[in-house]
Amino acid sequence: MSNKKADSKPQAKYPVNLLDTPFPMRGDLPKREPQWVKEWEERGIYDKIRAASQGRPKFILHDGPPYANGDIHLGHAVNKILKDIVVKSRNMAGFDAPYVPGWDCHGMPIEIQIEKQFGKSLPAAEVMSKARAYATEQIEKQKVGFKRLGVLGDWANPYKTMNFVNEAEEIRALGKIIEKGYVYRGLKPVNWCFDCGSALAEAEVEYKDRTDPTIDVMFAFAEPEKTAQAFGLPALPRADGGIVIWTTTPWTIPANQALNLHPEIVYALVDTERGLLIIAEERVEACMSDFKLTGRIIATTPGVKLANLRFHHPLASAHPGYKRTAPVYLGDYVTTDTGTGVVHSSPAYGIEDFMSCKAHGMTDSDFINPVMGDGRYIESLPLFGGLSIWDANPKIVDALNAAGSLLRSEKYTHSYMHCWRHKTPIIYRATSQWFAGMDVTPRDGGKTLRETALEGVDATAFYPSWGKQRLFSMIANRPDWTLSRQRQWGVPMAFFVHKETGELHPRTLELLEEVAKRVEQSGIEAWQSLDPRELIGDDANLYEKNRDTLDVWFDSGTTHWHVLRGSHKDQLQFPADLYLEGSDQHRGWFHSSLLTASMIDGRAPYKGLLTHGFTVDGEGRKMSKSLGNGIDPHEVANRLGAEIIRLWIASTDYSGELAISEEILKRVTEGYRRIRNTLRFLLANLSDFDFAQHAVPVDEWLEIDRYAVAFSQQLQTELLGHYEKYEFHPVVAKLQTYCSEDLGGFYLDVLKDRLYTSAADSRARRSAQTALYHLTHGLLRVLAPFLSFTAEEAWKVFQPASDTIFTETYYAYPEVAGSAALIDKWALLRDVRGNVTKALEEARTANRIGSSLQAEVTVHASGARYDALTSLGDDLKFVLITSAATVVKVDDEAQESVDVAASKYQKCERCWHYREDVGAHAEHPTLCGRCFSNLFENGEIRSAA
């Protein structure tokens, strides 16, 4: 500022260098953020990032597709923002890290929406047309929400599993796994939802408590002589009685075909008021109590001795249709934790039952399977035909009681399988489905799918590490994958199946490719409208079109094929570096992707898996409508700003649950303000600084400036290490400490005197500004991945000629000679300064001084502290923010102390220091000597601070 300007304004008689900046103190985020979203889109910022990244090594985060249905929720926000932080941080680390968002478009939820709106009788072609339109509308709605959160990506060209090219490539992927020999058709119990009318994937099953009748039922002796022999008796002492089972599914009793015992468990023959009962010996006492009977054990035998004995069906006396016997099979899965140690077996409705009966020679045609796809019994089932299985439960209990077979019935609350969409109970139901075999040896004679997938888990990096064992266990123990679904809105399993034998057409692989070509042009509708004669000619008399669709988990699970190497192969590559989803995806997308890639490529489709937890409220409770504790990200963005959501996510350890509440958001907002205020200070004090014109060479900087840059460079190295390991909450914690303590509480605090009172163009001030320039470059770039709106806003003030901060890479700080020693030295000085600050505060509390500048301090120091303090010379007072500072040497640390005295001198009107030379120039009676020099002469000389 010129003197003339000072004279024209009496209040600025002795001006200081107080500068302003267009970067406002108030973020006004809800208003400004949408403007940035619009600007980023209009100016093609994502494309500019891609152009700037050309030729760098690729880093591929592959987007797990959200379902194209409904508004985005807080879980979506967590997921998309974490991905955005990863992608931006990898771009800034010098990678070419594209982000192609995607959507999962087929499947039941959309089909249900179409049924709700238009009824269930629409022709298939119309269902598909309306489903496509609905999914497109939902995608556009969600896309707006994701962009509002500051997520940058190829929003103009996302992948959609319903795009024709993706549908076609999915059919080709199906061809690949058939060619390799993993796919077979079979009758097997699968998760079945009556409301869906379809099989469900494991990932579509959730568990909720349900209350059902639990019953203990007696199967009467059919072979009393053999039974007596098994127990080492010449004959049974009485004819009445039988073997007792316990079940929580009375509806399966009409389909009973066997009984299972453990070969090594000891079973007792117990004489009771209800006849002779066979029960596991260690369960006798509990069962007698439950049945309200008294009993005497008359013989025991291991389960193996009872193998192949037969017992009458418990409803045999109620209806001739049940006059059959059940054989005893042995199974290691039988336990004595609850029940009787005897398991009743309905092979059509239980996996272990099914496997046991198969192992004992039953064929598919032997299985009794009276439950239809809608949950009702077939009309011909004796006593219960036409009833829903749930309505039949009490009637079956009554019938068992009337037949004299019921020993106990009571209500039982247990965790039970439910459909994740309908929230209704589901069952295991034997149906003819297409499966991918986990333990099938492929045609090339190589490893099984299970073996290959487990090797893939071992070869994958997990963040956090506990995810490895979780996924490993799931793969190790899972059943074969049910690939087929009985729906319309899905990618077809485009097979031609022999009408009598059920065998695939011998030209299946060739035919799948022909279908894929048509789907590529016209979508899956091409299969629906296809006349078989077009492809198989007269074979159409022998073969029919398979009507099943693929599990939607196959849609998303093959995106490594139809997206990474298909629709978006120009941008992406296989394998991906990272898949990032919620912890539920160990049984979902992570899982299905691993299986399909293991079948197609013999390896995992990803190098790393990152898992985040779910959102909970401040008390750790899940978000739910009933609790009224849900938080809408759209509402928070419009009230506080998306930046606050981004900062909350980045500052939370996502490996566990992410707690959020109004109180937590308030704390996050306060943290944001501290960072923003730091940026405002930096930008304001650089507003008259032109690097090309004013920069001071590193070796001419004041010592504290060299320290600040060396310290910031060291911090950046730590932060980049955290970014590389996807550890974002330490990044935020360290940056908040850096802004509030290292900068605001120390360096910038010390700097204010030099910035404000030194001559505007002095070396001392320009040295400080040069350091601030480097600090601002570094700070904005490490903030940008998570505080994207704020970093961009500050960047446009700092570097107005630049398009965007997101084309930058992490800052290369200038090298500071002896930086490690410098950092160590200033750590000592800051420690002493902390002691001085404490002493000053005590003096202020005792009313001995006002501000710290009214104080003169004497520091008694020893050893390295003494050396560090004295090395600063007269500049020590600036570091301590006092008007004078003296150092006295003492022998050891025990003698170290700080003395504070009030200055006896006058206060300078301009710099507020209390100095002996205030008024030394008569024409400026309120000005100190150094301010006079800084204003009217060559300015003071400063070397350290």
Swiss-Prot record:
Q: Which residues bind L-isoleucyl-5'-AMP?
A: 581
Q: Which GO terms describe its biological process?
A: isoleucyl-tRNA aminoacylation
Q: Where is this motif: 'HIGH' region?
A: 66-76
Q: Which residues make up the binding site for ATP?
A: 625
Q: Where in the cell is it found?
A: Cytoplasm
Q: Name one Pfam family in it.
A: Anticodon_1
Instruction: Give the catalysed reaction(s), semicolon-separated.
Output: tRNA(Ile) + L-isoleucine + ATP = L-isoleucyl-tRNA(Ile) + AMP + diphosphate
Record-annotated residues binding Zn(2+)? Answer: 908, 911, 928, 931
EC numbers, comma separated: 6.1.1.5
> What are the record keywords, sorted?
Aminoacyl-tRNA synthetase, ATP-binding, Cytoplasm, Ligase, Metal-binding, Nucleotide-binding, Protein biosynthesis, Zinc
**Which GO cellular component does the record give, naming just one?**
cytosol
- Top-level taxon of origin: Bacteria
Q: Motif 'KMSKS' region: residue span?
A: 622-626
Q: How is the cofactor bound?
A: Binds 1 zinc ion per subunit.
In the record's own words, the domains note is: IleRS has two distinct active sites: one for aminoacylation and one for editing. The misactivated valine is translocated from the active site to the editing site, which sterically excludes the correctly activated isoleucine. The single editing site contains two valyl binding pockets, one specific for each substrate (Val-AMP or Val-tRNA(Ile)).
Function (record text): Catalyzes the attachment of isoleucine to tRNA(Ile). As IleRS can inadvertently accommodate and process structurally similar amino acids such as valine, to avoid such errors it has two additional distinct tRNA(Ile)-dependent editing activities. One activity is designated as 'pretransfer' editing and involves the hydrolysis of activated Val-AMP. The other activity is designated 'posttransfer' editing and involves deacylation of mischarged Val-tRNA(Ile).
Q: Which family does it belong to?
A: Belongs to the class-I aminoacyl-tRNA synthetase family. IleS type 1 subfamily.
Q: Which NCBIfam families match?
A: ileS (TIGR00392)
Tell me the protein's name: Isoleucine--tRNA ligase
Q: Which species is listed as the source?
A: Burkholderia cenocepacia (strain ATCC BAA-245 / DSM 16553 / LMG 16656 / NCTC 13227 / J2315 / CF5610) (Burkholderia cepacia (strain J2315))
